[in-house]
Amino acid sequence: AESSHGFVQEITCCSPLGIAVVDNKIIVSQPPDLIVYTDVNRNARFDQGIDQREVLLTGFSGANHDHSLHSVTVGPNGQYYFNHGNKGSQVTDKEGWELNAGSFYGMKQVSGKPSSDGQVYNGGVALRVNPDGTGMRPIGHNFRNSYEQAASSLGDVFQNDNDDPQACRTTW
């Protein structure tokens, strides 16, 4: 890029670990929230009263911590794919489906607590959700700190778990 500029500035956005631009939507991973800004007038600036700000999901632990909520990518099915590290989460989607994911590193109060599907999720979790905040479902868990994922045209999702342990490997 030959130039850059700020789109939005908020006191609560102090160290987002992911920014995705999907058409006129800017998706910011700022724990505890996954925020969607919609640039309604498409002028590449957030205009209060014209543009929209929505907290799509909330409940991700680890504000200002690298083992928290990471960036969104879009799969071939149009769903948002994202993950969070092992700081944990207790997140409810727009339909009321609840994810509980704890670990020794964070959110110990939900460790061992089943999510809405009856499953117990540990550590970092990879997820998908519809753009309207419904249909959130885990697609993998027990990661340390996976930063981002890529979805193939066939829907396979690849990610690389981050950090020191030998167990941190590329998964799909």
Predicted feature locations:
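Beta-propeller domains with acidic blade repeats across secreted/periplasmic ectodomains
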Residues: 1-172
